[in-house]
Design a protein with these regions (language model features):
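Bacterial N-terminal signal peptides that target proteins for export
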Residues: 1-9
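Bacterial N-terminal signal peptides
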Residues: 9-18
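Sec/Tat signal peptide C-region and signal peptidase I cleavage site
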Residues: 19-23
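Structured C-terminal helix/loop/strand segments within mature extracytoplasmic catalytic/sensor domains
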Residues: 24-57, 65-67, 209, 213, ...
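Active-site-adjacent helix/loop patches that line small-molecule binding or acyl-intermediate pockets
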Residues: 37-52, 56-60, 68, 123-204, ...
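A short, well-structured edge-of-sheet supersecondary motif
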Residues: 52-90, 292-293
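Active-site SXXK
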Residues: 95-118, 131, 302
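Short, well-structured active-site flanking segments
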Residues: 111-129, 140, 231-235
Length: 331
């Protein structure tokens, strides 16, 4: 016979297990969860692609008088769906994201929409469009609130702040579950500065700012472009928002269509080429993440991040142009 204390112990353990299961189920309702069928892409370094990228970066860094650590770049050729050829320069170096992080928030939101954990509304649709098409910081703040069930406000006592920060890290946990490493995607973007709990979350001196690598950024864009991150309908919706008409006569120096990688297509006279991208710029950073399809069959992701050369608009498109030219010549 079981002793009363033994029976009580069994009941307590059973209750704890049930509670844990219920809690996990509850978390799954709000967490951004990796699909059971998800398989991370297979990437293999290509010596030819590496030589092309190394020369392009070296030429631009020399001409632009870059210091070590001021540029990173990654290229992925996605023509073979079974195995992507890749090359990188400082591809695992963490750099401040600028607005490129908005692509990560878009992808996370589409995951939640596909899973039925978030419902699309006209306001959410407006925010998503403005975040990607116009790179609106205010729209990004709203999207991150929706994704993490957090909101800006005053600083909080430590225990309350830790609970808030755990929720704010929801997007980080999602990408970590997919095998993304060395990134931090948990902060809002601002035109000026963060205040209150947003500054508290940044640890006041920016130690917890958004950070990305060109490797992680290129991987995500490649997964979106090949329609493997979410279903085809949602993938096409993301690509629709990132589509850039590089043949337009936009005079904005920060135009995501005719500057950044778009300028490379203009300079190379790449008639018929298609461009999808998300750029980012601040007073110190100038980045672009671009996917290009050309009439001769190229399907390539090119991501270039630069720091301390934000007012020198020529460097990002120069790297892209050199890579695209070399790829054409090596066919």
């Amino acid at each position: 016979m079981f002793k009363p204390t033994r029976i009580l112990s069994i009941l307590v353990v059973s209750c704890l297990l049930v509670s844990a299961a219920v809690a996990q189920k509850g978390r799954d309702k709000i967490e951004i969860v990796k699909p059971k069928v998800y398989v991370a892409p297979l990437l293999e370094t290509s010596p030819n692609l590496q030589a092309i990228l190394d020369k392009a970066v070296s030429d631009v860094m020399t001409a632009g008088k870059f210091k070590p650590g001021e540029m990173a770049a990654t290229v992925i050729d996605v023509r073979d769906p079974a195995k992507w050829a890749t090359a990188s320069f400082e591809g695992e170096r963490q750099l401040y994201t600028a607005s490129v992080v908005k692509m990560f928030y878009m992808a996370a939101l589409e995951r939640q929409l596909e899973d039925g954990k978030v419902t699309m509304t006209k306001e959410l649709e407006r925010g998503l469009k403005d975040m990607i098409v116009d790179s609106s910081n205010e729209a990004t703040q709203y999207i991150l609130d929706v994704l993490t069930d957090t909101s800006s406000g005053s600083e909080l006592p430590q225990k309350q702040f830790e609970a808030w920060q755990y929720k704010r890290n929801r997007v980080n946990r999602f990408f970590s579950s997919l095998g993304y490493t060395n990134i931090n995607v948990n902060q809002k973007t601002f035109c000026e500065d963060a205040y209150g709990i947003e500054q508290q979350s940044r640890k006041y001196k920016g130690q917890n700012r958004n950070m990305l690598t060109t490797n992680a950024t290129a991987r995500l864009l490649a997964e979106i472009a090949t329609r493997r991150f979410v279903n085809e309908i949602r993938s096409n919706a993301m690509l629709g928002l990132m589509s850039r008409d590089w043949t337009t006569t936009d005079k904005d120096p920060n135009s995501q269509s005719v500057n950044f990688t778009g300028k490379a297509l203009i300079d190379n006279k790449m008639t018929g080429a298609k461009l999808w991208s998300k750029a980012g710029w601040t007073s110190k950073a100038r980045h672009d993440a671009a996917y290009i399809e050309t009439t001769d069959g190229q399907k390539v992701v090119i991501v270039v991040f630069t720091e301390n050369h934000a007012n020198e608009f020529e460097h990002v498109p120069a790297v892209a142009a050199k890579v695209l030219n070399a790829l054409k010549e090596s066919k």
